[in-house]
Amino acid sequence: MAKLSDIYQEQVIDKLINQFSYKSRMQVPNIEKIILNMGVGQTVTDKKLLDNAVANLTAISGQKPIITKARKSIASFKIRHGYPIGCKVTLRGKRMWEFFDKLISIVIPRIRDFRGFSIKSFDGRGNYSIGVVEQIIFPEIDYDKIDRVRGMNITITTTANSNNEGYALLSALNFPFRKNK
């Protein structure tokens, strides 16, 4: 098991039970899944870009992504319904905990001029979304072999019922939030 899942089981559950006075351990919020989404809008002109994005996301996540398709046609963007426009991966279980551990301990410290994530990125139900500007912050990506720098969205889905519970869960797992001044 990943070391963060052990920390969650041994320390975080008890801390959150005391903080929110839950009656059962099953009420304590948990990370349900992590979704990595990479949109590749330039696939209209070059089909190879999507293959490179899939390869990057496979290296980052450790599993093969699915290709996302356009839900409707938009003439100004030159896309049609069903046209491939990106890729995404949903991580659960052991891979999710390993990715979350890698994200906190290796990837986030490699972001230039990083001062912490804003707490305003919660969605109202305890889920948190991050936008990563460049994929080269991940150690699996070789800078010399990428065709172009592209970003991705990372969504951490929790079983929390509110933003306060989600914030408490991620803070207890040492997620780097910005300190309000």
From Swiss-Prot:
Pfam families (alphabetical): Ribosomal_L5, Ribosomal_L5_C
Alphabetical list of PROSITE patterns matching this protein: RIBOSOMAL_L5
InterPro entries (UniProt xref): Ribosomal_uL5 (IPR002132), Ribosomal_uL5_bac-type (IPR020930), Ribosomal_uL5_C (IPR031309), Ribosomal_uL5_CS (IPR020929), Ribosomal_uL5_dom_sf (IPR022803), Ribosomal_uL5_N (IPR031310)
Molecular function GO terms recorded: rRNA binding; structural constituent of ribosome; tRNA binding
GO biological process terms, semicolon-separated: translation
Family designation: Belongs to the universal ribosomal protein uL5 family.
Name recorded for this polypeptide: Large ribosomal subunit protein uL5
Gene it is expressed from: rplE
